[in-house]
Amino acid sequence: MEIKEIIPNLNRTVIYNDSEYTLTGSTVRKDVQGRIFYQAELLDKNKNSVCIVRLEDVKCLNL
């Protein structure tokens, strides 16, 4: 997923590791070398848990 795809996909189904999740948020962080990176907050509908993953690893579900 790209940064520009975050807002249109909030609270929508996305794919991560070949499973469906709900994108519930995104976080911007800075690593120790000063590089900016994004994380996605994904809700696992089956286990009712939240996963924090690399934004690049999330795919939009194109309906």
Where is each model-derived feature located?
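Exposed regions on extracellular, virion, or secretory-pathway luminal proteins
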Residues: 1-3, 45-48
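Short beta-strand-centered aromatic/proline hotspots
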Residues: 20-30
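Intrinsically disordered, low-complexity, charged/polar segments
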Residues: 46-63
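Short aromatic-glycine-enriched beta-strand elements
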Residues: 35-40
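Mixed-charge, Lys/Arg-rich low-complexity intrinsically disordered regions
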Residues: 1-12
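A short local loop/turn or secondary-structure capping micro-motif enriched for an aromatic residue
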Residues: 30-33, 60-61
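Structural motif
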Residues: 16-17
